[in-house]
């Protein structure tokens, strides 16, 4: 199945000069959504995953069904102030400054094998901050899986050395 047929392209969103890749049509099509989830599950099957971690918000949309299919837990990564218990945080650079991500301080147990799942790999800032928090908690990042990679934005270089699965590539 060519999943690219289920990605909408919106020019100049969220700001002028940016091309936004919208996964909503993929999620709206049961066959395409199921196919994408199965592809990530297949990638994860031999990795002995204990936990899925997904950054908000689209990492939840992709990561939760993967966790369900694998029979493992899901740990959310969120912006500050969105998680109710003790958190750890990591900072990363965005185009116009520094941003922060958090996760519960007890989300990952030492030695747990973790798969990070998100919709998009662009510059790699979000996933790099997520890796930092997982490793700080003693987890082992067994892999990273994305629906889309935007080529030319150096996301792969940011997470060099980590096994990575991407279902589709688009120009960045």
UniProtKB/Swiss-Prot annotation:
EC numbers, comma separated: 2.4.2.7
SUPFAM superfamilies: PRTase-like
Originating species: Streptococcus mutans serotype c (strain ATCC 700610 / UA159)
This protein's GO CC annotations: cytoplasm
Protein name per Swiss-Prot or TrEMBL: Adenine phosphoribosyltransferase
Subunit-structure text: Homodimer.
Pathway(s) annotated for this protein in UniProt: Purine metabolism; AMP biosynthesis via salvage pathway; AMP from adenine: step 1/1
Annotated catalysed reactions: AMP + diphosphate = 5-phospho-alpha-D-ribose 1-diphosphate + adenine
GO molecular function: adenine binding; adenine phosphoribosyltransferase activity; AMP binding
Pfam families: Pribosyltran (PF00156)
Listed GO biological process terms: adenine salvage; AMP salvage; purine ribonucleoside salvage
Sequence similarity: Belongs to the purine/pyrimidine phosphoribosyltransferase family.
Domain of life: Bacteria
InterPro entries on file: Ade_phspho_trans, PRibTrfase_dom, PRTase-like, UPRTase/APRTase
């Amino acid at each position: 199945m060519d999943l690219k047929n289920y990605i909408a392209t919106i020019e100049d969103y969220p700001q002028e000069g940016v091309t936004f890749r919208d996964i909503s049509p993929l999620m709206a099509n049961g066959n395409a959504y199921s196919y994408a989830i199965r592809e990530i599950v297949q990638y994860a099957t031999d990795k002995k995953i204990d936990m899925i971690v997904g950054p908000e918000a689209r990492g939840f949309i992709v990561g939760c069904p993967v966790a369900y299919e694998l029979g493992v837990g899901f740990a959310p990564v969120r912006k500050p102030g969105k998680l109710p218990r003790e958190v750890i945080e990591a900072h990363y650079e965005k185009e116009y400054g520094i941003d922060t991500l958090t996760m519960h301080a007890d989300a990952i147990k030492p030695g747990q094998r973790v798969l990070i799942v998100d919709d998009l790999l662009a510059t790699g800032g979000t996933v790099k901050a997520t890796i930092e928090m997982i490793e700080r908690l003693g987890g082992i990042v067994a892999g990273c899986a994305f629906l889309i990679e935007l080529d030319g934005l150096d996301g792969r270089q940011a997470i060099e050395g980590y096994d990575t699965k991407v279902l589709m590539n688009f120009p960045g």
